[in-house]
Regions:
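Alpha-helical transmembrane segments of multi-pass integral membrane proteins
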Residues: 7, 34, 60-61, 89
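C-terminal membrane-associated helical module and adjoining short loops/tails
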Residues: 1-22, 137-263
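Juxtamembrane helix-capping/reentrant segments at transmembrane boundaries
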Residues: 71, 75, 79-92, 141-147
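Alpha-helical transmembrane segments that form the membrane-embedded catalytic/substrate-binding core
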Residues: 85-101, 148-155
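Helix-coil boundary and interhelical linker segments in multi-pass alpha-helical membrane proteins
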Residues: 46-57, 100-120, 160-176, 224-234
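Transmembrane-helix bundle segments that line or gate the permeation/cavity pathway
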Residues: 131-135
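Membrane-interface helix starts
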Residues: 27-36
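Membrane-embedded alpha-helical segments that form the functional core of polytopic membrane enzymes
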Residues: 35-84, 99-104, 116-127, 180-183
Length: 263
């Protein structure tokens, strides 16, 4: 799967690191083997119920993130890309995403109130919607240069880490709620950011994208309402929306400048 939006962290730190690592992989090992290995590791932790150990879950999320990036880079660098590889990669993203969400949810279940549980479930469905959209277009268009999927996974690693170091429930709740706010705003940005691209899509693609956007926006508005009702934090939304509008206008201006340069 190709990625449309990479972050500064990925481009400047992670990508060079992965390229060095893939050079040491024997060419008799295929990218699909790495993808399947990734699935088996996560599935093994899930079946054995070792995810109740915060350290095991933290390492599992790290391994998933590492191998998920590595198999794609290795496939491109070794020129072993294939349709089967894309299908396996897409399937892994959704299936492993479901497993990781479930394992995190079960690990923190005793410390989450009803509002937070609902918000996390809504964020999860929003992520699945974006993954399905990405499968249709054969690329990930999620995030921007300051925050992408890699940063989101790094944040998720810290959730079981807090549990492992036996921090107080209050601190765990503060971090989890903060993570909820970040993911909600991140998802709203992705929804709004894709709106200007609708006019460039072909006729068959528009119903899929419009349905995705409407569903996503509804999910995120409900999430933000629940969070605002719980913490009375409606006022940051206005500041955030201004920031989102600025990002979209700036991105559109850059695209227009690039078109002028090309012409």
């Amino acid at each position: 799967m190709s990625v449309a939006n990479h972050s500064l962290l990925y481009d400047n730190a992670l990508l060079p690191f992965y390229k060095k690592i893939q050079a040491y992989i024997p060419r008799c090992i295929t990218p699909n083997m790495i993808t399947i290995l990734n699935l088996l590791i996560v599935l093994g932790v899930f079946i054995s119920k070792q995810f109740y150990n915060p350290l095991v879950l933290m390492v599992t999320i790290f391994i998933y993130s590492f191998l998920d990036n590595l198999d794609g880079i290795y496939a491109r660098e070794s020129k072993q890309t294939s349709n089967l590889g894309e299908i396996l990669d897409h399937g892994n993203d959704i299936f492993i995403g479901i497993l990781i969400f479930y394992m995190l949810f079960m690990l923190l279940n005793g410390e989450l109130d009803t509002y937070t549980k609902i918000i996390l479930i809504l964020i999860f469905f929003n992520t699945i919607l974006f993954l399905l959209k990405d499968i249709y277009f054969h690329k990930i268009d999620y995030g921007f240069k300051y925050f992408s999927l890699d940063e989101a996974l790094i944040l998720l690693i810290f959730v079981p880490l807090l549990k492992y170091f036996n921090t107080t429930k209050q601190k765990n709740k503060l971090f989890t709620n903060g993570l909820c706010i970040i993911l909600i705003l991140f998802s709203i940005y992705n929804s709004i950011d894709f709106i200007p691209q609708i006019n460039t899509l072909d006729y068959d693609s528009k119903p899929i994208i419009i349905t995705n956007l409407i569903t996503t926006i509804v999910i995120m508005l409900v999430s933000y309402y629940l969070l605002a009702k719980k913490y009375s934090v409606i006022w940051p939304a206005f500041i955030y929306y201004l920031f989102v509008v600025y990002l979209i206008i700036n991105k559109q201006n850059n695209k227009n400048k690039n078109k002028l340069l090309i012409n």
